[in-house]
Curated annotation (Swiss-Prot):
Chain's role: Involved in concentration and sorting of cargo proteins of the multivesicular body (MVB) for incorporation into intralumenal vesicles.
Domain BRO1 positions: 7-414
Listed name of the protein: Vacuolar protein-sorting protein bro1
Stored InterPro entries: ALIX_V_dom, BRO1_dom, BRO1_sf
């Protein structure tokens, strides 16, 4: 039973002539991109891949080579044009339906891709024929998968390469082999079923429907071949017709077995008679096919007519006689005539598989990518892809900027709400009648600034700096005066023989600059004195501000007049105690809510930074190229952008959740604050606070005024110290330069005396004069 599969049809491969990619490809790259681009190794690897694909074995390795070359061609088609203005290369392929004709020659890359796909179909069909003839469960599975892929690729060829040249790429021929290979895949299922089940538990009804489906596919194949112009190879039509008849016969046979299991002898006998008639016709059709045909598995074809004959004479005829005998003696069922038999509904067990599933459905995509390998020319990005990527980058930038603006708006809103609620002021109010005196917030801020400055020490430092600088100037002037005196003495003793330049001329630039500094230092000292006098006016207030106990002492008298804290706890009404407790709970809740809102800020900032990095690193070049490959099913640019931008949704949703949470927390803070301000105890404390504020208003105003004056003084002192620092640095430079110049003049004087000693007899007198020089 399992060897009743019909002889399997397969395709011969298209032959090709040598096409060298190296020279035209190199020329194109040099012309467009210049000689600086080095892709020689990639071009050679691509050329070798074509040479390998031109002559592959009927093995899995051969399939991988063909698919790898096709994948690289697919990559190439999106990066470089071919033909006159592109890579000037032509391809020559044979036509398997017209082997004696000249090779078809074209420069189209689509023609090259179609021919490679055709050879992939032919290789899969030959592998399927070899597997199916082994008659094992695993071989039937492998054959079925090959045929599913072959039919799927044939469909792709027919739909994607409409105007491909050659009869073997004709639309009707491709439609024919699509149906033929898919029909043979159904036969593999029947072969698998016959091995997996015995006669007693085989699902004959299902087998009948699958066989009917195969017969229908073979019938469609016959119509497609007959529609070709010029006519297709008649042997193709004979084989498809014979296979159709055989599968119709087997469908009737399987349905008969199904009816026998249901004890419907009349129907079973009718189907058996129909099967015998159709299978006899199929046997004659197979006998009419020549054994020299090179597209059918020959061992199967030579044995198959005898196999059908044996099946008809033994299994089928024996079953028919047994059924007729049982019907005559037991069932007495009316035998249904052949024309009245119900038509068997076809059920296609296996669909065609697209090229994307050539290596399986689960991990097939990753496997296919490994087979193809990296794009050899991925460094060359098509201009259309570059333009689209640039537009997409603008869209991602818009997404980020929108979220950045919203984050800033939310932070501003939070700060505004905090300022309006002023939690610290609410806390001041609630503590306004406690024994522990509070210092107003404005005074606390002023106090912190003054403590960090320490005005008294800084003013003393001003005067010390001024005095020090004046001493440095006096020292420099003294050095100049000593040098002038020595020079004058030597001039008086030696007269014209003393050639050293005049000291007044030498010292003039130094004296001028030093006098200017003395003048400005005098003005600065006057300013320092004015600052000191001004600070003396506010010194007491500043010292008071810097000492919290002094402030408390000043405020104590006004507080005592409104203080009720002297009451015993037993004297406080229960209602007031409850209000006090509620007020404390509300304040604690406000602090907690404020803390929770503030924690949202760093979380938002971290999420925003992650969004920025994701936007900057996002690259959809590969997606754009893959989308271009889909052709009719390709998305337009806006749709693709919309789909790609969804990858940012998790981060954006996290930000939006933060916004919503902030709104809820701020609303809750507003509600709690409103309840707090309606609390009678809070209203009482607010009245106390206002009384304290009004009584201490003048005191606070004076202290704040003094703090502002002290702040202005601190700024003046800082500028003065900065000025003195600049003057000190300049005086250090003057002192260094002057020291070097004085040393040089003394050396010049020594040289002058040395020359005089060689021409004068009064050596002792000159030596005495030399000792006067303090070298």
């Amino acid at each position: 039973m399992e060897k009743l599969a019909t002889p399997f049809f397969y395709l011969n491969k298209k032959e090709t002539k040598h096409s060298d990619w190296v020279e035209p490809f190199t020329t194109f790259v040099s012309r467009i991109y210049g000689n600086s681009v080095d892709v020689e190794d990639q071009i050679k690897a691509f050329n070798t891949l074509r040479e390998n694909a031109a002559d592959v074995d009927d093995t899995v390795a051969g399939k991988d080579i063909l698919y790898s070359y096709y994948g690289q061609l697919d990559y190439l088609s999106f990066r470089f044009p071919t033909g006159g203005n592109g890579i000037n290369i032509s391809f020559e392929w044979s036509d398997i339906l017209d082997p004696d004709a000249d090779f078809v020659k074209q420069s189209s890359l689509a023609f090259e891709k179609a021919s490679v796909l055709f050879n992939l179909v032919s290789l899969l069909s030959r592998m399927a024929a070899n597997h199916a003839s082994a008659y094992t469960v695993d071989d039937y599975k492998a054959a079925a998968n090959c045929l599913q892929c072959a039919s799927g690729i044939a469909k792709l060829l027919r739909e994607s390469f409409i105007h491909a040249p050659g009869r073997d790429l004709d639309s009707n021929f491709l439609l024919g082999i699509y149906n033929l290979f898919l029909g043979q895949a159904q036969e593999c299922v029947l072969g698998h079923m016959s091995f997996s089940a015995s006669d007693s538990n085989m699902n004959y009804s299902l087998a009948a429907k699958i066989a009917s489906s195969a017969a229908t596919l073979y019938d469609s194949c016959v119509h497609a071949f007959e529609s070709m112009e010029p006519a297709c190879n008649p042997n193709f039509i004979r084989l498809a017709s014979a296979k159709k008849a055989a599968l119709e016969g087997f469908s009737s046979y399987f349905m008969a077995r199904a009816q026998l299991e249901k004890s419907k002898q009349g129907l079973a006998i009718g189907y058996l008679q129909q099967a015998k008639s159709i299978l006899s016709s199929a046997q004659k059709l197979f006998n009419g096919i020549k054994l020299s045909t090179d597209f059918i598995h020959k061992p199967s074809l030579s044995d198959y007519p005898q196999t059908i004959s044996t099946f008809i004479k033994s299994s089928l005829s024996h079953l028919l006689k047994t059924a007729e005998k049982d019907n005559d003696f037991v069932f007495h069922d009316l035998v249904v005539k052949e024309v009245e038999l119900p038509k068997i509904s076809p059920l296609q067990a296996l669909p065609p598989l697209p090229l994307e599933k050539l290596y399986g459905s689960q991990d097939g995509f990753e496997t296919a990518k490994k087979i193809v390998g990296d794009d050899l020319f991925k460094a060359f990005v098509p201009s259309a892809v570059t333009t689209a990527s640039s537009l997409y980058s603008e869209e991602t930038a818009k997404v980020f900027r929108a979220e950045q603006a919203e984050v800033e708006r939310q932070n501003t809103q939070m700060a505004t709400v905090f300022a309006s609620l002023d939690l610290s002021r609410l806390q001041e109010i609630t503590h306004s009648d406690s024994k522990t005196n509070f210092i107003p917030k404005e005074l606390i801020e002023a106090r912190s600034q003054l403590i960090s400055f320490n005005p008294t020490f800084k003013i003393h430092e001003l005067f010390a700096k001024s005095t020090k600088l004046k001493q440095i100037i006096a020292k420099i002037k003294s050095d100049l005066e000593v040098e002038a005196n020595e020079n004058a003495k030597m001039k008086a003793k030696l007269g014209p023989s003393w050639t050293l330049s005049d000291s007044l001329e030498f010292a003039a630039p130094y004296q001028s600059e030093l006098n200017n500094y003395l003048k400005t230092l005098a003005e600065a000292s006057a300013t320092d004195s004015a600052i000191s006098q001004q600070y003396a006016l506010v010194k007491d207030d500043v010292e008071t501000l810097c000492n919290s106990s002094k402030i408390s002492a000043l405020l104590e008298s006004s507080i005592s007049s409104t203080d009720n804290s002297g009451q015993s706890l037993l004297d406080i009404p229960i209602e007031q105690e409850e209000q006090e407790r509620d007020m404390k709970i509300q304040l604690d809740l406000l602090e907690e809510l404020q803390s929770r809102v503030q924690k949202l800020v760093p979380e938002r900032q971290t999420t925003l930074q992650a969004l920025q990095q994701k936007c900057l690193q996002d690259d959809i070049s590969e997606s754009l190229m893959q989308n271009s490959k889909r052709k009719d099913s390709a998305l337009d640019t806006n749709q693709l952008f919309e789909l790609e931008l969804k990858k940012f949704d998790p981060l954006r949703n996290r930000l939006h959740a933060s916004y919503r949470q902030q709104q809820l927390l701020l609303n809750e803070m507003r509600n709690v604050t409103q309840k707090l301000k309606q609390n009678p105890e809070f209203l009482r404390k607010m009245e106390v606070y206002n009384n304290q504020f009004s009584k201490n208003k003048e005191l606070c105003s004076n202290l704040l005024s003094s703090s502002l004056t002290a702040k202005a003084i601190s700024e003046g002192v800082s500028k003065g110290l900065e000025y003195y620092k600049t003057v000190e640095q300049r005086l250090a430079e003057i002192n260094k330069t002057l020291g070097e110049q004085l040393l040089l003049r003394r050396k010049q004087g020594a040289t002058c005396l040395s020359k005089l000693s060689s021409s004068s007899s009064s050596h002792t007198s000159i030596s005495s004069n030399m000792r006067n020089l303090h070298i």
